[in-house]
Amino acid sequence: MNDKTENTLSSDVTEVRAQKLKLLREQVGDVYPAHFHRTLTNAELGAKYESLESDVETQDVVTVAGRVYSSRNSGMFMDIHDASGKIQIFSHKDTTPEEARALLPMIDIGDIIGVTGIVRRTKRGELTINAQKIEMLTKSLLPMPEKWHGLSDIELRYRKRHLDIMTNEDSKLRFQQRSKIVSGIRRFMENDGFMEVETPMLQSIYGGATAEPFKTHHNTLKLDMYLRIAPELFLKRTLVSGLTDKVFEINRNFRNEGVSTRHNPEFTMMECYWAYADYEDMMDLVERLFETLALSIHGTTEFDFGDKQLSFKGPFKRVPMPDAVKQVTGIDFLAIKTDEEARTAAKAAGFAVEKDWTWGECLAFIFEEKVESTLIQPSHVTHFPKDISPFAKEVPGEPRLVERFETYCNAWELGNAFSELNDPEEQRRRMVEQLEQAHARGEKEKQLDEEFLDAIDQGMPPAGGLGIGVDRLIMLLTNAPSIRDVILFPARRNKAD
């Protein structure tokens, strides 16, 4: 069947449905009522009558509602689904009034109906409602995709997510699990004594990460503003305030950068700060959180992702970045003393590095190129270069490294954490240096956040900070190959493109 034929058939079906809608308006009146009272969801009905034996009819009258997914024998048998599950509807001249049966020819797959009737279980063991009353609640003007095949076009699944979920039980389950995971993160953090706050999504100065922001303009304030790339600086100001010693936020960040199977310009992060803790405390927190989430979704800490079996049972492997690079490439960065020596060693090993790269930039680049892909089971990579970590405390005895770790699994970065820098003079020095580097890269709009520095001058307690990429974590826990599979309505090109 070609596209032209398919579009013609779809148009014909739509016209037939429109004619039925016209007749229904004339015969019934309002076929899109504002309210309908059901006594049970389909799942509640199934649970209540779980022990009902086959070929038994009760005297119980119930009212249910849902979308029609299948119709057999001219509507004698229909399956209707609500969000909780399905129930079979039976309409017959011996049990169903003529007024209710008269509606059957007007009902199409995809319509939403309400049904009142007697509960029974068929000889084949199917829980069924013998319809006594049927009401049209929503007339669907478009045909549903074929239930058993769903939407085969992946892009169409993202563009028309409502149809994807309507016809794909895996997609429906995945988004139910997403809700459970996000709620689980929030519950875990609150039970651990963290207070949830909300910080600005619109910011006049963007910071807390190195990324390209989305820019907008506030007409009343006559002020250019940015969608936040991270909540870090505001959360630290909250810590300074003394409102709480343990603060967190679950919300979206926005970065005007590439789209891939692991990147979406709008994504969900959980970021938290814990006064009087350090990065090792944050490692423990990550392990406890991940284990809790795995148990809530799978009932065990071990689960499959693609052809791999992953384990969220702590403790996770911990390895300093210089050690990890040495193990994989043989390059001993701790024995290298200067930036020039680092570039020379990297080039000798076959890596293309920029002529102005520092020791730390060379180390981080080689780690990303050669080591990340080896980190399949959950691992904390610690001791990052200070060059690329302006907000972390130095490792005692090794001023080129900082108390920072990233958590990896399936070769993906899932989390990033520091022993947070709270020395106001060192913080200013590093932020000024970072600003100069940004301006050198052509990021002329980048500004120094003096309000944040003023708060740090006031005094921030020692603290551990952590950010977790919620979408990637959900990908792992739900066996989703693309980030767009776990974002309800992901970024996509316009249809015309």
UniProtKB/Swiss-Prot annotation:
Gene Ontology CC: cytosol
UniProt-annotated binding residues for Mg(2+) 1: 406, 413
Subcellular location as annotated: Cytoplasm
Protein residues bound to Mg(2+) 2: 413
Highest taxon above the source species: Bacteria
CDD domains to which the protein is assigned, alphabetical: LysRS_core, LysRS_N
Molecular functions per Gene Ontology: ATP binding; lysine-tRNA ligase activity; magnesium ion binding; tRNA binding
Cofactor note: Binds 3 Mg(2+) ions per subunit.
Swiss-Prot/TrEMBL GO biological process terms: lysyl-tRNA aminoacylation
Family per similarity comment: Belongs to the class-II aminoacyl-tRNA synthetase family.
PANTHER family referenced in this protein's UniProt entry, alphabetically: LYSINE--TRNA LIGASE, CHLOROPLASTIC_MITOCHONDRIAL, LYSYL-TRNA SYNTHETASE
This protein's name: Lysine--tRNA ligase
Source species of the chain: Rhizobium leguminosarum bv. trifolii (strain WSM2304)
Gene behind the chain: lysS
